[in-house]
Amino acid sequence: MARYIGPTCKLARREGTDLFLKSGVRPLDSKCKLDQPPGPKLQRRTRMSDYGLQLREKQKVRRMYGVLERQFRNYYKEAARQKGATGTVLLQLLESRLDNVVYRMGFATTRAEARQLVSHRGVQVNGRVVNVPSMQVSPGDLVGLKEKAQKQLRVQAALEMAQQNGWPAWVEVDPKKFEGTYKARPDRADLSAEINESLIVELYSK
């Protein structure tokens, strides 16, 4: 399965919520009609079965983090092997992806931008260049940008926006050095309340 490169509003409308696929410069409601599913204008959202709800939640989270189906299932299997609530560990694994950490540190306005930054060898982890977006970042790791990446206008604009909005509690960023520390895996309370990971666990437990 290839990575989706079509209209991001279509995905957000499909799930009926913001998937944070846009830069956030303008409110998403001004771009996407989240209360209407994609398709004919008069089409309404139908009442879904339990399975449908579980599937939609899985698709929503998978698309939010930009992960393919096989990758997502592997994350679930790994989460089930680790100690702790499987749903919470699943989200922590997704949050620990290098592309997501770059996004959380404010070096990119979207996860897709962060993924591109990593793929183009613009990111260093503990002083070494890493071009694998799915790499798991460990607590204590230092993530920074190469000098060439620091000069990109979109990176500078993203970091300026992050300084205005603030950073998550689990990262510590030095904007002057274009680097930050991944302090710890985030607690569940620190993550989006709009994600119902228990539905994903129910789906994969069948």
From Swiss-Prot:
The record's listing under Pfam families reads: Ribosomal_S4, S4
Q: Does the keyword ATP-binding apply?
A: no
* Alphabetized SMART domains for the sequence: Ribosomal_S4, S4
- Any GO MF annotation of the entry: rRNA binding
Q: Which GO terms describe its biological process?
A: ribosomal small subunit biogenesis; translation
Which UniProt key words apply to this protein?
Ribonucleoprotein, Ribosomal protein, RNA-binding, rRNA-binding
Domain named S4 RNA-binding is located at 96-157
Q: Which PROSITE patterns match?
A: RIBOSOMAL_S4, S4
Identify one Gene Ontology CC term for this UniProt entry. small ribosomal subunit
The entry sums up its family as follows: Belongs to the universal ribosomal protein uS4 family.
Job of this protein: One of the primary rRNA binding proteins, it binds directly to 16S rRNA where it nucleates assembly of the body of the 30S subunit.
Q: How does it assemble?
A: Part of the 30S ribosomal subunit. Contacts protein S5. The interaction surface between S4 and S5 is involved in control of translational fidelity.
The name under which this protein is listed is Small ribosomal subunit protein uS4
Question: Which gene name belongs to this protein?
Answer: rpsD
